[in-house]
């Protein structure tokens, strides 16, 4: 029996949202019992994780309300990254903090404005489009140059002789996530289908970044929620690529 597009999206979105809710509840129950668990940070990261998933589900479906939930998500993510960077024993993720606080946050308003110009509303999907060859070349060049620049800057700011090998690995993933998020947000705001290729990479590197933090800093209880969050983001980004491929067919 063939499942309709509308029904598939409904069930997939429900799976992502319900699955994320259950994962957060189970994680909280477990982590609250651990000695030294930081309850406030755990709950805050959980709220951010849930609003972030709603944000990405709406984005995958071309709904402009994605920017409302995105505003909540990036505000919380900014605080989580800041706390991780300044807390004694925490890992420096200043690139992640700068990304959310000084770029992602204002870009929610830019994206809302741009999607409105392309016909999006709470009931009408945005008119998606695709990159041409020249735009792909520009995107690739920006990624290469941005990654090298971000890595060198973050190494200079966050390098540590005592833990150089581990810290520099964290900084590499931090730089990759930083640059990919910047490029992905631009593509998202301008309604390009190829944003989802970028988001898939962002989610893979983010899982590695926060997974490494969870293993190296067991007292950072909220990092587990961040790992789960990006796993669901990854699944949703695959569906987003599928949906936007159809939305952008024949568009430039």
Can you annotate each of these PLM segments?
Residues 99-115, 127-155, 173-180, 184:
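Alpha-helical transmembrane segments of multi-pass integral membrane proteins
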Residues 184-252:
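C-terminal transmembrane-bundle signature of multipass membrane proteins
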Residues 54-69, 186-198:
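Membrane-helix interface "capping/anchor" motifs
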Residues 16-32, 75-84, 146-156:
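Membrane-embedded alpha-helical segments in integral membrane proteins
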Residues 30-32, 79-96, 156-164, 214-224:
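Helix-coil boundary and interhelical linker segments in multi-pass alpha-helical membrane proteins
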Residues 25-38, 57-61:
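Short, hydrophobic transmembrane alpha-helix segments
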Residues 1-18, 133-138:
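N-terminal membrane topogenic signal
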Residues 72-118, 124:
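Hydrophobic, ordered structural segments
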């Amino acid at each position: 029996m063939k499942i309709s597009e509308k029904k598939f999206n409904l069930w997939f979105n429900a799976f992502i949202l319900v699955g994320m809710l259950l994962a957060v509840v189970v994680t909280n129950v477990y982590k609250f019992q651990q000695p030294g668990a930081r309850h406030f940070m755990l709950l805050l990261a959980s709220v951010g994780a849930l609003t972030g998933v709603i944000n990405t589900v709406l984005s995958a479906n071309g709904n402009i309300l994605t920017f409302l939930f995105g505003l909540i998500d990036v505000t919380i993510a900014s605080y989580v990254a800041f706390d991780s960077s300044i807390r004694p024993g925490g890992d420096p993720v200043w690139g992640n903090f700068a990304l959310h606080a000084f770029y992602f946050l204002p870009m929610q308003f830019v994206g809302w404005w741009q999607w409105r110009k392309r016909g999006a509303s709470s009931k009408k999907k945005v008119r998606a489009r695709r990159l041409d060859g020249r735009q792909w070349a520009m995107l690739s060049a920006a990624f290469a140059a941005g990654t090298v620049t971000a890595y060198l800057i973050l190494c200079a700011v966050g390098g540590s002789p005592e833990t150089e090998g581990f810290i520099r690995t964290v900084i590499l993933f931090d730089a990759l996530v930083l640059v990919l998020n910047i490029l992905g947000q631009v593509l998202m705001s301008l309604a390009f289908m190829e944003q989802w290729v970028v988001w898939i990479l962002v989610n893979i590197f983010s899982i590695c970044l926060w997974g490494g933090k969870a293993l190296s800093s067991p007292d950072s209880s909220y990092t587990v929620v961040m790992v789960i969050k990006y796993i669901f983001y990854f699944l949703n980004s695959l569906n987003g690529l599928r949906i936007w491929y159809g939305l952008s067919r024949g568009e430039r």
